[in-house]
Amino acid sequence: MAKDNSWVFGIESTIFTIVEKRISEKLSDDYPDLYITNSDKNTDDPVFPTIYLHELPGSEQGNDLEGKDINAVMETFQVEVTSARSQQEAKKVLAEVLMVFKEMRFQITAMPEFKSGDETYRSIARCRRLIGASECDTLGNK
């Protein structure tokens, strides 16, 4: 009998919810206007600092002989922090986000890259982890 493979399609929202909750708890005093999103479009006025979590295409892992079930997925998230104040602020916020990913046993695969434009500063990193079918409910456990 095949398992319900719908867990795969909820990974992004599960990870987003965990990160949003933990980062809000850690940084709300220092950054009361902190904005966390997983959408690449925003029609509102920009709010800084902004954390953008982007799920990159994953790949199925751990196939069995029947091939009907998704047993695990290699997940990668790109984290982008944008600040209007300073590169230091972007680095500080990104460091906190990466520690949340480390608490969930993600590996940092692309260390922070720093970019600055005319009016903003960005810090970008990527995190990857193999997530098994039975793990989605326990990702938020420390």
Predicted segments, located by residue:
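Small/polar-rich, solvent-exposed N-terminal microdomains that initiate assembly or binding
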Residues: 1-64
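Compositionally biased, intrinsically disordered low-complexity segments enriched in polar/Pro/Gly
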Residues: 1-6, 71, 135-142
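Hydrophobic beta-strand residues in large extracellular and virion-surface proteins
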Residues: 15, 19, 23, 34-36, ...
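A generic structural micro-feature
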Residues: 45-47, 68-73, 117-121
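Oligomerization/assembly interface segments of phage tail-like spikes and tubes
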Residues: 71-85, 121-132
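Acidic-leaning, charged glycine-interspersed low-complexity segments
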Residues: 92-142
